[in-house]
């Protein structure tokens, strides 16, 4: 995520082959946090999830909420937590202002949940607490956070929406 390999692939590979760098050398948690925070800060507004986001959300989902609570064999889809339709309605300008393509706005949902959900939140379709466990295990926005995000969208308060998305990331 630090783009250490971009445009220096062969040179960088030689550094590892000659042992001036080593994949086996652990970085500190602080170094990782700094690199991750910088990567989050460098995100640009948009709506389509990039390869890096898809990769990270797949790893997270498989190590957390998908591994324990969702049946095997189920088909999954990437989902915009703040629905794409709602983001498009609030931010249709170019360039975009909302980080709809961010890690904080992405999760996997089983197709059976995602298709009927459309532009709603999981809270809006959570009849009889049907999705409460998924909401908890996926680190979905709290109801209060989701309400703040919807109010900020309505008010075109892009910074507040982006702040919530960055925080969830």
Provide a role label for each language-model segment.
Residues 1-81, 86-91, 108:
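Intrinsically disordered, low-complexity N-proximal targeting/linker segments that flank membranes
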Residues 3, 55, 65, 101, ...:
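Intrinsically disordered, low-complexity segments used for protein-protein interactions
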Residues 18, 48, 62, 72, ...:
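Detector for Asparagine
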Residues 76, 89-115:
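Short beta-strand-alpha-helix junction that forms the catalytic/metal-binding core
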Residues 77-79, 105, 114, 144, ...:
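Residue-level signal for functionally critical sites in structured catalytic/ligand-binding pockets
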Residues 84-86, 116-119:
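Flexible loop/turn segments at secondary-structure boundaries
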Residues 120-125:
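Short cysteine/histidine-rich zinc-coordinating motifs and their immediately flanking basic loops
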Residues 127-169:
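C-terminal, well-folded lobe of enzymatic/effector domains
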